[in-house]
Amino acid sequence: MKYTNIVIGIIIKKNKIYITKARKKKYVLDLWEFPGGKVKENENLTYSLKRELSEEVGLKILRFRFFRCIKYFYKKIKLYFFLITRWKGRIYSKEGYLYKWIFLDDLKYFNFPSPNSHIIHDLQKMIFFK
């Protein structure tokens, strides 16, 4: 079974997380998300993550680490989440989407796609947010 691989960056700065308003698609209408996108053919995850975040939020990633992978059999997708803690450049929405820096505890006030609920729960357990 062939999967579509998607890389997602969780950008962390001083106990806040960067979120963007999801694109207007039928399955993500009025939702928030972490920036990222599809892995292109012949790209590895690291290259895709750096490319996607440069394209979407204008940053050059300097420090990151793998966080979680979630596989969705029914949609045939794999979501690869990375924690980004250091970068170069000023973060903004290059694609014109609404964005916010929010505290981890405030994530509960925003609607996210269902796969993110596991990620948000795991983030809340992490020491560097305490």
Curated annotation (Swiss-Prot):
UniProt-listed GO biological process terms: DNA repair; DNA replication
Catalytic activity line of the entry: 8-oxo-dGTP + H2O = 8-oxo-dGMP + diphosphate + H(+); 8-oxo-GTP + H2O = 8-oxo-GMP + diphosphate + H(+)
Keyword Magnesium: yes
Cofactor(s) needed: Mg(2+)
Cross-referenced Gene3D superfamilies: Nucleoside Triphosphate Pyrophosphohydrolase
Pfam family, one: NUDIX
Classification via InterPro entries: MutT-like, Nudix_hydrolase, NUDIX_hydrolase-like_dom_sf, NUDIX_hydrolase_dom
Cross-referenced PROSITE patterns: NUDIX
Stretches assigned to the Nudix hydrolase domain: 1-128
Motif (Nudix box): 37-58
Residues that, per the record, bind Mg(2+): G36, E56
Gene Ontology terms, MF aspect: 8-oxo-7,8-dihydrodeoxyguanosine triphosphate pyrophosphatase activity; 8-oxo-7,8-dihydroguanosine triphosphate pyrophosphatase activity; 8-oxo-dGDP phosphatase activity; 8-oxo-GDP phosphatase activity; metal ion binding
EC numbers: 3.6.1.55
Keywords: DNA damage, DNA repair, DNA replication, Hydrolase, Magnesium, Metal-binding, Mutator protein
Claim: Magnesium is one of the keywords in the record: yes
Function: Specifically hydrolyzes both 8-oxo-deoxyguanosine triphosphate (8-oxo-dGTP) and 8-oxo-guanosine triphosphate (8-oxo-GTP) to the related monophosphates, thereby cleaning up the nucleotide pools and preventing misincorporation of 8-oxoGua into DNA and RNA. It prevents replicational errors by removing an oxidatively damaged form of guanine (8-oxo-dGTP) from DNA and the nucleotide pool. 8-oxo-dGTP can be inserted opposite dA and dC residues of template DNA with almost equal efficiency thus leading to A.T to G.C transversions.
Cross-referenced PANTHER family: 8-OXO-DGTP DIPHOSPHATASE (PTHR47707), NUDIX HYDROLASE FAMILY PROTEIN (PTHR47707:SF1)
Annotated family: Belongs to the Nudix hydrolase family.
Protein known as: 8-oxo-dGTP diphosphatase
Gene of this entry: mutT
